[in-house]
């Protein structure tokens, strides 16, 4: 597949220009430079870009740049020029509410991806632990079901490293367990759900009791006990020494060399392969408690509030809004999110077919042994979009890897999702986001 960084060389945007007769002059920043480049671009008040397509803005950014007069309110543009996004808001009013700032304005166009709902949403768990079944079988071990059994299994991986390396041709050495700390889907927090009260931890450290009380996970006794247990694993050389510092590329490289006994990620095929790993079930804690704390915001599926913004330098806001609205068209959003079809000399994500009614429908191609993340990044453009549950088998088929993940999630974890509530996607004020930042630092 193509891997150009120039958006105008992406087939998706080339087709969009043909359809709309709108040419975009893009400035493209590579991912590891984006935050700094974005801040510099938005500091040039007299020479701002018209907008940011993949803005990557959190609540604090949106409110700060709005207060400074750098980004503009969008609600009137949405109501006048964006029928596709309006339809999404009408079908799911909670998304409009979630996009609305405390001052009543909407400052950004969102990214929305649904697959399943409630406890059965694919986003209910992000950081799935995958354990190496091939190693378990070779060592004649079962899949662990308690924290004590997991520790013994990791010890077995460590103590039989030489045998495993010889048997499976592992280069670089066996790593019993690896992760990327505080990195969303790559974080190991799911392992400590069985400690204490059973809240474990979430990416933003909020949880909701069955009585509807919002709590902060890191001050709970169960969290402290779980962290002490993880510390024991580190002390016994069961954890990758780079787990607290490594970046995604390093994490993946070691996985592709088949070095992991246990790792954490959204989809194991991005790290290693489906054949060698199984999902590690919810582990019973020291007192026998078994629980899966669902990912916050997952009741409303995948949602990124600050995906796309317009600035005060945008002179034709109506045209910009109408063009962005095309990203929310039901046949366009899946392509922006995953990739496209019909690109010559490329690994295409889709082929264009038809649904049962004979209307156009995007059909996912078989990815084979390819990493879903890598092949999709070569064609997709991301940005603002919406993929709703109602679109599947009407405008687009479900991705095979997502269906595999969802089916296995339901089989392994659904029965242990005991909590009634998750913390919703709240648009906080600047004052509240500052407080949360202080708590995280402390």
Q: Where do the PLM segments sit?
A:
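Conserved N-terminal structural module of periplasmic/extracytoplasmic solute-binding proteins
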Residues: 1-149, 188, 200-206, 214-216, ...
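Extracytoplasmic/periplasmic substrate-binding proteins
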Residues: 2-8, 13, 115-130, 137-143, ...
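Long, His/Glu/Asp-enriched segments that create or flank divalent metal/ion-associated functional microenvironments
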Residues: 14-15, 265-268, 322, 406-410, ...
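General small-molecule cofactor/ligand-binding pocket signal
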Residues: 23-29, 242, 278-280
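Carboxylate/His-rich catalytic cores and anion/metal-binding grooves
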Residues: 69-99, 154-158, 168-207, 254, ...
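Helix-loop-helix "hinge/cap" segment bordering the ligand-binding cleft or interdomain interface
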Residues: 75-79, 102-186, 208-254, 307-345
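Polar, glycine-rich mid-to-C-terminal structural blocks
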Residues: 278-376
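Conserved small-residue motifs centered on glycine
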Residues: 332-442
């Amino acid at each position: 597949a193509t891997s150009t960084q120039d958006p105008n060389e992406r087939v998706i945007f080339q087709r969009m220009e043909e359809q709309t007769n709108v040419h975009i002059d893009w400035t493209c920043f590579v991912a590891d430079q984006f935050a700094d480049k974005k801040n510099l671009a938005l500091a040039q008040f007299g020479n701002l870009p018209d907008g940011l397509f993949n803005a990557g803005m959190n609540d604090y950014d949106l409110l700060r740049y709005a207060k400074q007069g750098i980004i503009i309110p969008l609600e009137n543009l949405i109501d006048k020029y964006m029928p596709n996004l309006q339809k999404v808001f009408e079908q799911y009013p909670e998304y409009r509410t979630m996009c609305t700032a405390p001052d009543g304005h909407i400052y950004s166009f969102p990214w929305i991806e649904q697959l399943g709902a409630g406890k059965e949403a694919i986003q209910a768990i992000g950081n799935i632990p995958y354990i190496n079944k091939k190693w378990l079988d070779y060592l004649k071990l079962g899949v662990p079901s308690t924290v004590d059994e997991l520790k013994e299994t990791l010890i077995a991986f460590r103590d039989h490293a030489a045998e495993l390396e010889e048997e499976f041709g592992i280069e670089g050495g066996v790593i019993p367990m690896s992760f990327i700390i505080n990195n969303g889907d790559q974080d190991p927090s799911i392992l400590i759900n069985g400690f204490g009260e059973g809240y474990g931890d979430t990416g933003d450290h909020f949880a909701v009791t069955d009585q509807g009380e919002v709590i902060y996970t890191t001050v709970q006794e169960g969290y402290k006990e779980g962290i002490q247990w993880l510390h024991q694993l580190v002390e016994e050389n069961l954890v990758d020494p780079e787990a607290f510092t490594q970046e995604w590329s390093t994490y993946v490289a070691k996985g592709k060399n088949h070095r992991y006994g246990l790792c954490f990620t959204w989809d194991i095929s991005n790290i290693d392969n489906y054949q060698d790993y199984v999902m590690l079930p919810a582990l019973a804690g020291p007192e026998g408690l078994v629980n899966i704390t669902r990912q916050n915001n997952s009741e409303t599926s995948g949602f990124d509030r600050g995906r796309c913004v317009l600035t005060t330098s945008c002179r034709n806001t109506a045209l910009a809004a109408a063009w962005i609205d095309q990203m929310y068209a039901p046949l366009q959003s899946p392509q922006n999110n995953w990739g496209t079809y019909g690109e010559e000399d490329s690994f295409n994500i889709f082929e264009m077919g038809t649904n049962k009614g004979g209307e156009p429908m995007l059909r996912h191609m078989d990815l084979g042994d390819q990493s879903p993340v890598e092949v999709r990044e070569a064609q997709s453009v991301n940005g603002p979009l919406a993929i709703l549950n109602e679109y599947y088998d009407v405008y687009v088929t479900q991705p095979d890897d997502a269906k595999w993940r969802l089916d296995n999630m339901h089989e392994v974890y659904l029965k242990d999702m005991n909590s009634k509530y998750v913390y919703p996607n709240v648009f906080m004020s600047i004052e509240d986001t500052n407080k949360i930042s202080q708590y995280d630092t402390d």
